[in-house]
Amino acid sequence: MAKNLILLGLPGAGKGTQADFIVKDYSIVHISTGDIFRANLAENTELGQKARQFMDAGDLVPDEITNAMVADRLNQQDVETGFMLDGYPRNEAQAVFLDKYLSDNGKSVSATLYFEVADTLLRERLLGRGRADDTPEVIDNRLAVNKAANLPLVDYYQKAGVLHTIDGGRELADVYHDVKEVLDNLN
């Protein structure tokens, strides 16, 4: 059975690293909304053109456009064996859209992996990246904004019965051991 996953967690929680392990071991397609946006912009698709208008104005791209881009990507053949969404959904409205879209296509979210890491460790990891724009103030703001966005999604998927909270503050191998345990027990 296809494994359809959502990765949640604050910046620095290790989602990308764990996603790489999952792709390697489970042959699941990793779908990043950033990649979807870049592809639509580069290919100058109709959705890309619409998104560009908002982005050029410094505005957030509306859910309808983001949802349409994700739906278009989920229609592609390579996701039949399973997919892993990273960076989507970003809010409860997008989560509701995704559930309906998947249901309409005979699919569902198999599991939502929420990587939980203490703020102090997240801050330390992000500062350790050495990016010029990663000042303590910027990092604290990014964590606060992302926490406000993540908590309703954690609650949404908890109520849906598909949330698996994983302690992302440990060694990579220990975190991945827990990820594998969840994935290997999905029906």
UniProtKB/Swiss-Prot annotation:
Keyword ATP-binding listed: yes
Pathway: Purine metabolism; AMP biosynthesis via salvage pathway; AMP from ADP: step 1/1
Identification of the protein by name: Adenylate kinase
LID as annotated region, ranges: 128-134
Cellular localization per UniProt: Cytoplasm
Organism, as annotated: Leuconostoc mesenteroides subsp. mesenteroides (strain ATCC 8293 / DSM 20343 / BCRC 11652 / CCM 1803 / JCM 6124 / NCDO 523 / NBRC 100496 / NCIMB 8023 / NCTC 12954 / NRRL B-1118 / 37Y)
Enzyme class: transferase
InterPro entries: Adenylat/UMP-CMP_kin, Adenylat_kinase_CS, P-loop_NTPase
UniProt domain comment: Consists of three domains, a large central CORE domain and two small peripheral domains, NMPbind and LID, which undergo movements during catalysis. The LID domain closes over the site of phosphoryl transfer upon ATP binding. Assembling and dissambling the active center during each catalytic cycle provides an effective means to prevent ATP hydrolysis.
Binding, AMP: 33, 38, 59-61, 87-90, 94, 131, 142
Catalysed reactions listed for this entry: AMP + ATP = 2 ADP
Binding site for ATP: 12-17, 129, 170
HAMAP family: Adenylate_kinase_Adk (MF_00235)
